[in-house]
Amino acid sequence: MSAFDDIRAPQIELMDDCVHCGFCLPTCPTYVLWGEEMDSPRGRIVLMRQGHEEISAPLVEHIDRCLGCMACVTACPSGVKYDKLIEDTRPQLERNFERPAPERAYRRLVFELFTHPGRLRAAAPLVAAAKRAGVAGIARRPRARRLAPRLASIAGLAPDASPARALKRLPRHFPARGEKRGSVALLQGCVQRVFFGHVNEATACVLAADGFDVHAPRLPRCCGALQLHAGDAGALELARDTIAALEGYDTIVVNAAGCGSAMKDYGHLLRDDPDWEGRAERFAAKVRDATEVLAEAGPRAERRPLPMRVAYHDACHLAHAQGVREPPRELLRQVPGLELIEPAEWEICCGSAGVYNLLDTGAEAVVAANPGCVLQITAHTSRLGRALPVYHPLELVARSIG
């Protein structure tokens, strides 16, 4: 049996901050679902401590089950840095624990496909054909989940991937309207660029309408968030590529919560690289969610009435990982006629099928600032026979501006 190595191992000192008070338990989706101590944040911290001596298969299983929602970080009265602990633990498992061959192949497939926009564009017609053929329904059948559970899960969450939308390119420059208030670079992303390019376009249009000069460079192809959250070493190279591509801009705006949380954490990710540590810290300080930039600046373009009742879902990597809760709400409240409804248990991750609280609001649409949340909520509401459209906040603001 192997144990954690000395390369960025999770720090015992950070583990010692946990006093086992249990405030994290009701906010942890896996603990709420299964009720197992080792599927809670404090239980996983115990396992991390054990990993310094021995990495066992049960340890890996319980760590893998963590959704990385960081709701425990928000709830913890002792300020335990669980986000740093889990980020340092996952790479240890990838280096020091041999996963079964099918699982290794699955993970490699995900990384080699989803972090490459060109490959995603090539796959878009296949995804669209699969959607038309009802693959999502087939994937929910017990036999499919038994034979290929991971692929069945992906099929069930597949986005609407019209080839025309996937192939559309975003203009590289959106000039500010009126007097310029600032200049920003918009991260296009990988999945966001291909399957949610309309969100990138809406983001750029709102920023430009409110006085920002928006640059949308083709590079980087991916910020590395997917691999970072999975503990894959490829995240380091993608982080360096992202810094090199965008560090010349004063502000880097992001409209995908998972990407933003990863990029704001580059300083921690590259802390042991003397050639990149300083650059990473300076870069991370310039990363802002698009809603932060717009809420701080205040509206300039006229907002026209948009009569809708919408429920706002807090994306975990925005609310918990970045601490950004009010800016998206503020932007939505600026839209005349838009009724914003707050769901119960806002802190619970939609990854644990947490959509009932959204349906209970009676809203006619859901608003979420992360593509993963959009896919998850869309899939689950459809599965329950109560399909709701899911928008990024800036899609509705853009529609209001016209």
PLM region descriptions:
Residues 3-15, 53-55, 60-63, 208-210, ...:
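Short, intrinsically disordered, charge-biased short linear motifs at domain edges
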